């Protein structure tokens, strides 16, 4: 799996595999451990992760109103990676302040995810680089 640009199938296999490994009590890599902590906060996705044959090719169109679990978990993982290296600089402090406001680290991550999704969409739509300053401004507006 490419660490920076995984395919849809690679992302799904990563989450299916880590769920199976965790259920079997197998050792996890540091990245898998980080991802497992996120998965454990989302029991609504455990059935999906436990049944790869049924869900490997499943689509979650936005108009259906049900979030794509793999996209959601991947966004959480991206945020945790950003926080671990404070990239963009200042995100740790911004998310810490969101945690205070929301009273929950998980809810702060969801608020952060709203901004991250918007920034990725803008970058793709405009064929432009990710705008760190606008991302941090979006987080500040959530306070």
Language-model features, listed with the residues they occupy:
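N-terminal leader/targeting peptides and immediately adjacent processing regions
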Residues: 1-46
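Short, solvent-exposed positions on alpha-helices
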Residues: 29, 47, 89, 106-110, ...
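Aromatic-anchored, charged helix-turn/loop surface patch used as a conserved interaction hotspot
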Residues: 31-99
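Helix-rich interaction surfaces within compact, conserved domain-sized segments
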Residues: 113-119
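Glycine-rich, aromatic-bearing surface loops/beta-hairpins
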Residues: 121, 125-143
């Amino acid at each position: 799996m490419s660490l920076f640009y995984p395919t849809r199938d690679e992302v799904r296999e990563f989450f299916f595999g880590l769920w199976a490994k965790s259920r079997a009590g197998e050792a996890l890599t540091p990245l898998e451990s980080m991802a497992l902590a996120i998965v454990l906060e989302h029991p609504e996705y455990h059935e999906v992760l436990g049944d790869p044959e049924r869900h490997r090719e499943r689509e979650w169109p936005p108009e259906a109103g049900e979030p794509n679990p793999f996209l959601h978990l991947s966004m959480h993982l991206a945020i945790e990676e950003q926080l671990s290296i404070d990239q963009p600089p200042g995100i740790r402090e911004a998310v810490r302040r969101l945690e205070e406001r929301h009273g929950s680290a998980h809810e702060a991550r969801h608020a952060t995810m709203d901004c991250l999704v918007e920034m990725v969409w803008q970058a793709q739509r405009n064929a432009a680089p990710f705008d760190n300053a606008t991302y941090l401004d979006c987080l500040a507006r959530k306070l």
